[in-house]
A protein has these predicted regions:
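N-terminal helix-rich module
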Residues: 1-2, 7, 16, 21-148
Length: 148
């Protein structure tokens, strides 16, 4: 009696069912990991934008304003007596919340963060992707910018 080697239809359906269950479990985890990576990248990018604006203000001896919208779009402008001159703009790729009014701050000639048009230093923070990963970019009173 010869025996044929192979899989039965029942074995094949069982393997497909197990594979479907494993995929259903893994896909949400992959999406969560992607959102964490996106928030990390956006926080690093915002910290770089803020540090660059601070260095620009110190190098030129004039205020530089950074505005960040809730959808992650940002703009950097030199503040002149005649108004603002755009320097850079871009997208962070994640939603942003801030305790700065309208998500805007200025770095003065000394590199300290202030509210737009203000003179007193003001610390604050930007929360990136609060609904998912919640990375925070902190601007300290002395001007130090760091990610947490």
């Amino acid at each position: 009696v010869s025996r044929q080697h192979g899989s039965t239809l029942l074995e094949l359906v069982t393997i497909l069912a197990i594979s479907a269950v494993l995929c259903a479990i893994a896909v949400p985890g992959v999406a969560a990991v992607r959102s964490v990576f996106a928030a990390d990248a956006a926080a690093d990018r915002l910290a770089l934008v803020l540090r660059d604006a601070q260095a620009r203000a110190q190098a030129h001896g004039a205020a530089v304003r950074v505005s960040v919208a809730g959808d992650g779009c940002y703009s950097v402008c030199d503040v002149c007596p005649s108004g603002e001159r755009p320097v850079a703009r871009g997208e962070l790729g994640a939603d942003v919340e801030s305790n700065y009014p309208q998500g805007a701050l200025e770095f003065g000639a000394a590199g300290w963060p202030t509210l737009p048009g203000g003179a007193s230093p003001r610390a604050g923070h930007f929360t990136i992707g609060a609904a998912t990963a919640g990375r925070v970019v902190v601007v300290q009173l002395g001007g130090c910018v760091r990610c947490t």
